[in-house]
Amino acid sequence: MNIQSNNSPNLSNNIVSKQVYYAHPPPTIDPNDPVQISFPTTEVVGHGSFGVVFATVIQETNEKVAIKKVLQDKRFKNRELEIMKMLSHINIIDLKYFFYERDSQDEIYLNLILEYMPQSLYQRLRHFVHQRTPMSRLEIKYYMFQLFKSLNYLHHFANVCHRDIKPQNLLVDPETWSLKLCDFGSAKQLKPTEPNVSYICSRYYRAPELIFGATNYTNQIDIWSSGCVMAELLLGQPMFPGESGIDQLVEIIKILGTPSKQEICSMNPNYMEHKFPQIKPIPLSRVFKKEDDQTVEFLADVLKYDPLERFNALQCLCSPYFDELKLDDGKINQITTDLKLLEFDENVELGHLSPDELSSVKKKLYPKSK
């Protein structure tokens, strides 16, 4: 693999040229053959623990892209590139190219050239919070459907758990209400025989089984995180704002009550004999006073202690909560059509279902007339 110096001389108009590799090479291209692209140097538009993100335009195609630059830490396994090369879905940010470069300190950086989206869901929500107006319930519903659609593909087709679902990792276009899942730096293909680290996922969105130290958790941790995202969009602030790992559990118990012995067993059997203060749950209808029964019931199905009782991504998509998006009804139907919301590749996204299950799911997924 070609590793370039990152101090390539700039042209007079600040254009840099790089040899890059296709993430999804066309049939006529050998994946090991680099292609040359050029783009203007630009300023940073985002940063995190992983590194920095630049926005720029590929000169050859006039395509706006984001370039995520990640230090290759030899102590940790970087699965992000290999996982992103596997993925192709309308609601997952597309990896177009990648290249490696070495800096003057001999550090190696992986550069991921990604599809560009205008902002994160976190930024979109902040806009409404600053305006002191709630986000439209219809906009929330569209974002959540697309999130669960991406997770259904990720969990069932790719067998990948994202492990860091939060508003900052959901990119949106506020004009079209399109949503795409990004940042696969924590993602992993979970195997039942292989333990996983429990200290994963940002605190406010951490599933209770992670807080209980489970190492054999499942893709269902992403569903809990998604429920926390939805709650935050409705409330305008995090539902469980813990100040530490244990305080996070306290915040959850304050609303959902003390988990039962059976629920604790499902999360982590090692805590079965642990004595917890007995707290009664608060009805979610009191937490979400402005929401209808259908919304509250849906959140109750997603925010369950027991990962086996928690809805999976496909059950979420089939929930009556989303029926409004499936109506053959003017404006809503147009948004649904434009976002290709109800277009599913049955071999890929629904391929894990038996014929009877597929028939039942299709009745719930596809458009309904009023």
Curated annotation (Swiss-Prot):
Belongs to the protein kinase superfamily. CMGC Ser/Thr protein kinase family. GSK-3 subfamily. It comes from Saccharomyces cerevisiae (strain ATCC 204508 / S288c). Keywords: ATP-binding, Kinase, Nucleotide-binding, Phosphoprotein, Serine/threonine-protein kinase, Transferase. Coiled coil: none annotated. The keyword ATP-binding applies. Present with 6990 molecules/cell in log phase SD medium. The active site is at 164 (proton acceptor). GO terms for molecular function: ATP binding; protein kinase activity; protein serine kinase activity; protein serine/threonine kinase activity; protein serine/threonine/tyrosine kinase activity. Disulfide bonds: none annotated. InterPro entries: GSK-3 (IPR050591), Kinase-like_dom_sf (IPR011009), Prot_kinase_dom (IPR000719), Protein_kinase_ATP_BS (IPR017441), Ser/Thr_kinase_AS (IPR008271), STKc_GSK3 (IPR039192). Interacts with TDA1. Serine/threonine protein kinase that is thought to function in regulating kinetochore activity and entry into meiosis. Could phosphorylate IME1. It comes from the Eukaryota. It is an enzyme of class 2 (transferase). This is Serine/threonine-protein kinase RIM11/MSD1. One of its GO terms (biological process) is ascospore formation. Residues 39-322 form the Protein kinase domain.
